[in-house]
């Protein structure tokens, strides 16, 4: 069973690699810096060193794979994030078109079902469509808002402030990336699916940002209050940080385009994962703020 894993050092990919190894599978990992791989796993995986933005590297590295787990590596701060995401995925799509790849599991996002108007998520929607057109077996995992996004504002949380441009009273699904890794590994190891499938990964429950602030207050042992900002406020901050216009709109659009979103896949047994935000925050966020 030949399985390729991209971004194997990330929150999701590292979990996938560990689970595949525990299942007796030696995955082929595409990684820019092998030193960042988990030391215990490094000697047990097939390492292909290169950059996912190098089309030739990707084309060669995925050739002959039974399955590929694809994670778009494009940073939201890229000069043209949507174009970069599509260009980066192009060699995978080409490999699927000519039969060099049999199955793809794509890390997508809720919001991709809208196809347009959701900022950088529009790129994932387009990648979904391009993979669908190849005719290979493809699974689009439309994932919820990552718990780990909270790690991007440790400075604010250290002051007891959670900043957001989302509607504070609108419930949305939140998920632990490790739970996504569990779903990915199970799908990669299974031969029981084929064709085009979409599966949401919604975490254990939908939460409003007001609820998140209360959960963090308890888990972190400190008062956490919401700081609501407007889309224009986010734009101003991103411009001040030097981000180019396409990146600014790609980031703002992900929030603005998701405010009224009702995910295409309803919450159900198949979409619900176990890890709750409070436990995750106590175990992973609190030590960082107390250190």
What kind of feature is each model-predicted range?
Residues 50:
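Cofactor-binding loops of NAD(P)H-dependent oxidoreductases
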Residues 69-72, 288:
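Short amphipathic alpha-helical segments enriched in hydrophobics
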Residues 231-291:
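A hydrophobic C-terminal alpha-helical subdomain
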Residues 59-62, 213, 252, 281:
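A generic alpha-helix structural signal
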Residues 2-42, 53-56, 63, 73-84, ...:
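Oxidoreductase cofactor-interface core, primarily capturing Rossmann-like NAD(P)-dependent enzymes
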